Amino acid sequence: MTEPFKVTFGAVYPSEVDSWYFQSVLELLMRGTPAGYAWASGLVGVRTGPNLAMGRGHLLGNFLEGTDGDCLVMIDTDQEFTPEKFWELVDCFRRARQEHENVGIVAGVTWMSGHPKLANPMPNMWVQGKHQGQYTHLQTYAPDSMIEVAAVGCSNLVVGRDVAQHFADQNINPFHHISVTNWPILAQVIAGWDDPAKIEEEMRRAVWNADQLGEDLSFCTRVTDAGFRILVHTGLEFAHSKTYLLDGDDYRRAINERFPDQEPTL
């Protein structure tokens, strides 16, 4: 008899759990697993403060040490999803690993936006920029397709156990990044410098890295540097709960307004 594919569901709680997310999790856990799948310790959660890099790193460690799961499904607590969408994402990961080499991550799509609601929603996908470590937001993409990208946000993705183990073997947190919370440490390092221009340059670099390489992009940079590939299924859309529920319809309306002279592709 074929062994089931074992799945662990992981979540990081930075402050609070959104009600849309709570309802999604309840519906998921109240249902049985599809044929060919089994839970590996069910839900693994990590409570953390604003340091998401630390929380996500602990989640990978708990996944490896506390479960025998083949994959870890990471869905942030401000996402809304259905059980069907959850298992379709897992199934996409499983099939992608069978059909392609070196697939480490498969993700769905969610969007980021400021206020008001249609203030330029952007998908959580990036392609490689001109230089290593630089990324360009992917604004438009083929609908309902599996595409390869350079980086994704960590809001909804499936990570292979071998990816987590790779970083555990190196004893590093792959989500670690330079952030503004590191300024006190940075100030200690440069306190002895007497060149104001050098100090200003270093501070600007720290802010740039914090803006451009948060914990999710830092993670993806290390994943691809290790030889793993990152795929996204653009048909799997996860609404992002802000002060409103930001979904694919909002994104498509914004794209059509942004490019009114182009034929709609989404």
Task: Give, region by region, the residue ranges found by the protein language model.
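C-terminal catalytic/acceptor-binding lobe
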Residues: 2, 171-266
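Alpha-helical elements of Rossmann-like donor-binding domains used by nucleotide-donor carbohydrate transfer enzymes
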Residues: 24-27, 58, 88, 218
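Conserved donor sugar-nucleotide recognition element shared by glycan-biosynthetic enzymes
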Residues: 52-56, 216
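Short, high-confidence coil segments that cap the C-terminus of an alpha-helix
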Residues: 68-69, 98-103, 228
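Short beta-strand-to-loop acidic/aromatic patch adjacent to the donor-nucleotide binding site
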Residues: 69-80
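Conserved catalytic core of nucleotide-sugar-dependent glycosyltransferases
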Residues: 82-196
